[in-house]
Amino acid sequence: HWKAMPEDAYLYSSAFTDCINHQAPQEMKPETGSKIVRLIVRAPQLRDGERLGVLGADKALGVWDVQKILPMTQHTYNEWVADIDATHLEGRHLEFKFVAFRNAKNELLWETSMNRTVDLPEMKAGELVSYELDQAFFALYNRKLAGTQVPVFSLRTRKSAGIGDFGDLKTMIDFVASTGQKVLQLLPINDTTITHTWTDSYPYSCISVFAIHPQYADLHALPELKDAKARAEAEKTRAELNALDKIDYEKVNDFKINYLRQIFNQEGEKMMKTAEYKAFFQDTELWLVPYAQYSYLRDKNGTADFNQWPDHQVWDEAERKALADPKTAAYKNVAFFYFVQFVLDRQMQEAHEHAKAKGVILKGDIPIGVNRNGCDVWTEPKYFNLNGQAGAPPDDFSANGQNWGFPTYNWFEMLKDGCQWWNRRFQNMARYFDAYRIDHVLGFFRIWEIPVHSVHGLLGQFAPALAMSREEIESYGLHFQEDRFTRPFITDWVLDRMFHERAGEVKEKYLDRLDDERYQMKPEVDTQRKVEALFADVTDEKELWLRDGLYALISDVLFVRDHTNPSVFHPRISAQLDFIYESLYDNDKAAFNRLYNDYFYRRNNQFWYQEAMKKLPKLVQATRMLVCAEDLGMVPDCVPWVMDELKILSLELQSMPKDPSVKFGHLSRNPYRSVCTISSRDMPTLRMWWDENIQRTQEYYNTMLYRQGPAPHPLPGWLASDIISRHLTSPSMLCILSIQDWLATDEALRLPDADAERINIPANPKHYWRYRMHLNIEDLAADKRFVQNITEMISQSGRC
């Protein structure tokens, strides 16, 4: 019969069944009697090592004797079944209870309900009567877990090659488990190779949502190079790279690709004849073959922009057969890429199995976008809108919004086939993870879509969204002046305010007179992309300041036209901070504010709810992984509706409360179904945040930590421990802290330069992702004082 998604749905995730409670469904051995009564019940509350049984008044059910429990079989996750031979029953009325027990049956936990009763029908020989009963009545223990978040590339061991790899990941899993932590959260591990330069270090710009980045290969897990000289040279290079404080992306990847090619030449033919390789190829060939062809053509043509390739500008399905046949010349071109992905898949699956054996949940990350020049777009372009760019509106991370450059998704096409691309993506991820974070879950409600001619995110609009007609705009009391409100607002006083003594230079070089009051940008600089190209080779700070001023001129509008219907409009995000808004009369400002607040916070709520419910249920149900979401930023009211309905864990940061009426969140108010953290990869670490704004820190110190006097600077280790302990005791199911924040508790271990621990600066789209732990994990694990400190904090918080 129909069951709604239960409140305890998380207990059915592989995170809990496979990693925490270690449940393995058993084969049901049917009772051999001629008349069978089958009892079926769900019992997700059972803990690791507990089993379910049934006791009852009938002789066949033990006559309430705890030594005569009828054991039940877990035939699927959290669902138990018992078959009773009806010929042994004393009557047709059954009275019973379910009991939880461990191996010693004298340690019983009885159901807290009244006795269950069932009245059996008349049964004929050979019949089976099945009863699917209400969930077992045991108290639901809200299990709370602690964990660490760290990118794989940031891991460091004595065996690393200048970057973290899947061997280092196993070492980190061991360390996490040794401190009583149960979760290890990673950043995306997908291949991002576009230019073979450091700009490929951005882990969210994947070229394939299926392929793994070759930089994560554990070279020590591969066969040894037979050539002694090559082996010695490789070890020398590895040691040099590993001595670096930060990742040298280009040197590391050149070294790893070269090493993998040597191993491929030495071992590839033999390894690719194994049954293990053949099974891998069969499982993955749908995406693997085009990925390998794409990678070969990218390197052959010297560019990832397939529109510039002399041929193969679109994936040709007719070539699949030849590319998959070892006897063809085409196969030889791509075999290396098959081999590398086989190696990476095997190593990552080994790390996954190692984590499960250690009771650690590996939590992955689903990037919201893909690179517009990547394999996914090349292979299945129908799923992507290439006439826009995905990003995010302005927030605490970036005053101009974020422009990720990714194409937006063509959900019309994706929904036509039931989101098969997404299902394949999630199912592939389940090979390696038991939980995942949906990056920018708001994008499944509506994405911030920016014109391709924009650099900043300010000229974007939510897509889809209910745009406004002229009549609707005027219904708020604002007389709609289309030309004035949709063109950049450039006047003499604006130029003087922005450019000061350089205002005349700007007028002469970059502007044309539009009318008596206003100017317009010259055609050669009338978009931000044109301005960007004009200043492409400029490094002088004064000229870059001028460039940024030109960007700001172009985005100074009150409304933007809808991307699909230019006769309707969207209010420009953060327009209240610009000169066009300043120029309005007070009554027009008030009218615009009413319109603005209604549009962004009320008008689209039901519409966006419906959009999300078309997509997210399909994705959430594609696998048994535990689903968490990054729901920060401009969050409409409909987001918690959907997340609650689908039982998705929210993200809670005390420094970014979801309640706009408070400056800091109250940890005690975190919902159970949430992930609590202090900092993310887009934020300063705890130590950086502490010194970033002295006034804010002082308020936090007095009002949240309840301490008197001036806050100490820099953040002392004992106070970092206090802050972490408070987060650990929050109601959140998961408390996952960055490795940098864990290290902040120990002044002898932590990196002296707190600024060097920053992973990403979202305001900089060209940021170099190169943070490495400054300590070897082996040395960290050997520091008994640090391990004991972390273990005790976690244990005392009730997380286990």
Predicted segments with their positions:
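Aromatic-rich carbohydrate-binding modules that target alpha-glucans
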Residues: 1, 45-93, 101-123, 161, ...
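Catalytic cores of glycan-processing enzymes that make or break glycosidic bonds
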Residues: 2-34, 85-88, 118-800
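A short, amphipathic beta-strand motif
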Residues: 36-42
